[in-house]
Structure formats: C-alpha cells, structure tokens
C-alpha cells in the first residue's frame, strides 16, 4: 500500500465559499429585542455563531434572562432561554460557538441589562451550477487516480522490506502486593 495520497482525493468534493463577519448586539431596557434577518431572495445560508453573552458596565445586580427564537429542523419557530446572568455570580457566559440559522431573534425577558451578545456571522454560498460541474471533474480525476494506483501496487512490495516491524509495548509484570489488615 502506498503512503502517498493525492491532495484531490484527500480533500473530497470542493467546499462551498464561506465568508465570516463579526456579529454583536446589545439588549437593554430601551432595546429589549434584536432580530437578525436576511434577505429571502438570498440563496446563501446565514449562520449566527455565538461565542459570549455578557453584562455591560452599569448593569444592576439582578437576573438578566436572554432567550432566543429561531427555526428548528422542521422550520418551526422555537423559543428557548439562552442565558441567565447576574452581576454578583455570573456576569458572562461562554456558549462555545452556538450556531443558529437565520432568522434569529434575541430577547431580554428579565432584567434591564445592558447585555452584550457577540460572535460570528457566517455566510455559506450555494452555487449549484459550480457544484455540478465540479462533481464531473472529480469523477474524471478519480478515474485517473484509479489508473495510477495500478502502477503503484508493484512498488508496494519493495517498501515492506525497508520498514522495520514495530512490536507493541507490553506492561511490566510486577508482583501484586497484598494489604495486611490488623484488627
């Protein structure tokens, strides 16, 4: 078996174009709700990838509850609490790249804020025409690689002689110690 893998075979089909932008919004007693919407005519997939939700300067020591409304896998809106922040015990939460597909609505349901939501906005372009053309190219490349692999099979036998056989490391045999109990 050859240790060389061509770069096109390892990569698989071409990945779609992804653009990344900084995302952030503020919720407070003045602005209780923020909606992230995209143009319906846009064929790209828009993802909001949240990183942190934190209380801002001037926040009171009260519970600030943030909830999010977004579509689920059946395209029905679902509302769930996202964070419960309090200045004295949890002023910030790291949500660890929590991805939500647009449209997304953030709402401050309790407290006066300010609450800052930050993360990234990813735009995944969908080019159906480019993908269909590249699939045909990939099939042609795979056929060429299969033809090349036949030539490499003869060389594989020579490579086995050069390599040393590696034996697994076995644990050392130690005598078991018995615990003596005195009562």
Swiss-Prot record:
Q: Name one GO biological process term.
A: chromatin remodeling
List the cysteine pairs that form cystine. Answer: none
Q: Where is this region: Disordered?
A: 126-183
Where, subcellularly, is it found?
Answer: Nucleus, Nucleolus
Acidic residues bias spans: 126-166
One Pfam match, given by its short name, reads Nucleoplasmin
InterPro entries (alphabetical): ARM-type_fold, Nucleoplasmin, Nucleoplasmin_core_dom, Nucleoplasmin_core_dom_sf
Q: What is its main location?
A: nucleus
Superkingdom in the source lineage: Eukaryota
**What molecular function terms (GO) are annotated for this protein?**
chromatin binding; histone binding; RNA binding
Q: What's a GO cellular component annotated to this UniProt protein? A: nucleolus
Q: Which UniProt keywords apply?
A: Nucleus
- Protein family per UniProt: Belongs to the nucleoplasmin family.
Q: What is this protein called?
A: Nucleoplasmin-like protein NO29
